[in-house]
Amino acid sequence: MSPARFESRGAASAPTISALARKSPGPSPSIAACTAARAFMKAQDSTDLTRVGPGTVMGEFMRQYWIPAALSSELQADGDPMRLMLLGEKLVAFRDSQGCVGIFDHRCPHRCASLYLGRNEESGIRCVYHGWKFDVRGNCVDMPNVPARQEFKDKVHAKAYRTTERNGLVWVYMGRQQESPPPLPNIEANLIPGNEIWCLQRECNWLQALEGDIDTSHVGFLHVGMLKPEDLDDDHPMRPTVINRAPEYEVRNTDWGTMYGGFRTNDDGQMSWRVAHFMFPFWTQTPNARFSSRAIARAWVPMDDHHSMLFDISGGVDEGNPAYVSKRRNGQPLYEKFEYEPNTNDWHGRWRCRDRAHNDWGLDRQSQRDGTQYTGIGNITIQDQAVTESMGPITDHDWEHLAPTDQMIARTRRRLLLAARAYRDSGELPPGASDPDTFMGARAGSFLFAPDAPLEQAYQAQLEKAVRWTAQPEERA
C-alpha cells in the first residue's frame, strides 16, 4: 500500500483539539495547577487509575477497547499454546489449523485444568485431562469421554474473547459486546504494511510506565544529560533539548485523549516543537520521530497491576527514530543496544530485558562519573525502565510533588479518571471507542515553526503536510 494522505471527514466530525484559553506568562497558574493535581491524587483516585483486574474501574474501562495481545509471529498454526496475562486474567492463546487465533481463559470449563497443557491440533485446542476440544470461538466441538447419548457439548463454551490481526499484531477484545465488538481503532502506525513492532515487559504498573512517554522534560537529563551542544551536529534533532533542558509547555484536551507541545527557541530564532499524545485507554505517541514522515504508537498494556507490556509500533518513509540511530559529532553512537532474556513459558516470561532490577539495570558507576552516560546506563530504553521500575510496583502518589513541567501527566490522569468513572456510572465512552478514525487526529514528532505561533496553528500546519496512511478493511476471527 502506497502512502496516502488522510482526508478529513468534515469539520463536524473530524478529530479535534479542544480550544483552551492561553494563560498569561507567570508562575502562578502552573503552580496552582500542580498543587491541585497533587491534591486530586487521593488514595481512591490512585486505586481507580492503577488497578486493572475484572470489576475494577480502570479494568472495566479498558475492556471496552481492542487490546494488543501478542505479535502475530508468536503464534504458529497448530503450534504450542502460549500463556498470556492480560488485565489480571490468566489466558491461553493459540493459532488453529486455519491460521485463526483463539484467546481463552486458560481453565477448561469441564474441571478447570489448564488449556495451556492442551493439544493444539485439527482446528482446535484439546484439553489433555478428558479430551474435550474447543474451537477458536470457545465452542466445545468434541466431548469424547462422555457416551454419545449423554454428551452435551452444545451447552458448553470456553470463556473465549474475540480476536483479530492487522499488520503483525494480534488484538483481543475483552469487553461485554463479544457478538458485536466495536471497530478496530485506526492507530496509524498499525496501518502501515511492513511496520516495525517490538515488545518489552516492564515490571511495574502500567500508569507509571506510560507516564514516562508523556514527560518530555526528563529527556534533557535522563537521556542526554551527558551531552553538550558542541557534541552534536548543528541539525541534530536532540540539539535543542541539550541547549535548553527546561522547556515550556502547552497542553490540550483532544478527542483521543491529551496532547502536549514542548517548545524551545533554537539557534536561528525558530520555535522547536516536540509534540506527543496520550490516546485512550493506554496508548502514547512520543516526539522522537520525524513528524512529517513517520508514525509511531506505543501501547502500555497492563498484564496485571504489577506488570505491563509495551508494544512499540512504527513505520514511515525515513530511516527510523533519530534519537536511537543518531551519533555524536565525533561519530560515537549515543546509546548501546539492549539484550532480551530468552522467553519462557510462565505468566511473566515474555520479552524481558537482561538488565533489570536484579542487577540495577546494568548501572555502571564509572560510566556515570566519566560522562559517558548521565545515568551510567547505556541504553535509552533501559534508562526509562530503571527509573519507572525503581518507583516500586505501583507508585505511591502521595509522595509526589508535581512541577509545572508535569502538566501533561496531571491532565492525562484527570482525563483517564473522569473517562473511566463516566463509563462506570453511565456507560459513556470517549469517541475513539466507537469511531476508529478518532485516533487519526494524532501525530507526534519534532519540527520547527515560526516563533509566537500557537500550538494549534503549528500542529495543524504540520499535519496537513505529513505523509499519512489510511485503514484497510479489517479481518476478524
Model regions: which residues?
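Short Pro/Gly-enriched beta-strand edge/turn motifs at strand-loop
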Residues: 63-77, 139-147, 277-284
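Short acidic (Asp/Glu) patches
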Residues: 143-158, 293-294
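Short cysteine/histidine-rich zinc-coordinating motifs and their immediately flanking basic loops
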Residues: 119-124, 138-142
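Cys/His/Pro-rich metal-binding microdomains
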Residues: 106-109, 125-128, 141
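A structural signal for short hydrophobic beta-strand segments in well-ordered beta-sheet cores
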Residues: 93, 120, 132-134, 162-163, ...
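N-terminal pre-ligand scaffold of iron-sulfur
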Residues: 34-121, 151-179
